Amino acid sequence: MVLTRVIRAVGRSTLLETGVAGSGGGQLQLVRLPLRRKYTYRSGALKPMPEITPFGLFGIIATVIPGLLIGATISKNMANFLEENDLFVPSDDDDDDD
């Protein structure tokens, strides 16, 4: 029942009504738009479920922690470079906004 609703909704969404501007009768033409089907083949058969690769909490930790460490290392090296070449030297007097 749900599948028939999906197929009907997909069929309706691919039809485009266009009116002919030159004709006074206002005839409508149905133009079928190309459709990229997500769930079904052209024959109507359902596509198989995609393979899901579970990463979980370990995958998140394995990507976030190295990213933070690499970013911190790069920023530390850039701050040292700027200070060594006297391009930016922080002073203690700038901290007071009185």
Curated annotation (Swiss-Prot):
Cell location: Mitochondrion inner membrane
Provide the disulphide bond pattern: none
Q: Which residues form a coiled coil?
A: none
The residue ranges crossing the membrane are: 52-72
Against InterPro entries, the record matches this protein to: MCU_reg (IPR018782)
Presence of keyword Magnesium: no
Record keywords: Calcium, Calcium transport, Ion transport, Membrane, Mitochondrion, Mitochondrion inner membrane, Transit peptide, Transmembrane, Transmembrane helix, Transport
A single cellular component GO annotation: uniplex complex
> What are the recorded Gene Ontology BP terms?
calcium import into the mitochondrion; mitochondrial calcium ion homeostasis
Regarding protein family, the annotation reads: Belongs to the SMDT1/EMRE family.
What's the stated role of this polypeptide?
Answer: Essential regulatory subunit of the mitochondrial calcium uniporter (mcu) channel, a protein that mediates calcium uptake into mitochondria.
**Name listed for the protein in its UniProt record:** Essential MCU regulator, mitochondrial
